[in-house]
């Protein structure tokens, strides 16, 4: 597990990004339309992003599994 994470929110784009590592990586689709995984060259999850994050509320939370191959 990462010692630190980096997270930022772009209100205009309604976009949240969370990174567990600064390692080079790429975005990969998940089963959830709003979520993308960020994986490194070995396929390890090093972060994720959420589009349309404001539609997820306490009564309608986002639930997604981050599973890299």
List PLM regions with ranges.
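Small, basic N-terminal interaction modules of short regulatory proteins
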Residues: 1-69
């Amino acid at each position: 597990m990462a010692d630190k994470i980096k997270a930022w929110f772009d209100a205009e784009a309604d976009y949240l990004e969370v990174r567990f590592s600064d390692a080079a990586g790429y975005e990969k689709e998940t089963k959830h339309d709003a979520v993308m995984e960020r994986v490194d060259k070995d396929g390890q999850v090093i972060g994720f992003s959420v589009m349309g994050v404001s539609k997820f509320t306490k009564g309608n939370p986002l639930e997604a599994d981050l599973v890299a191959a």
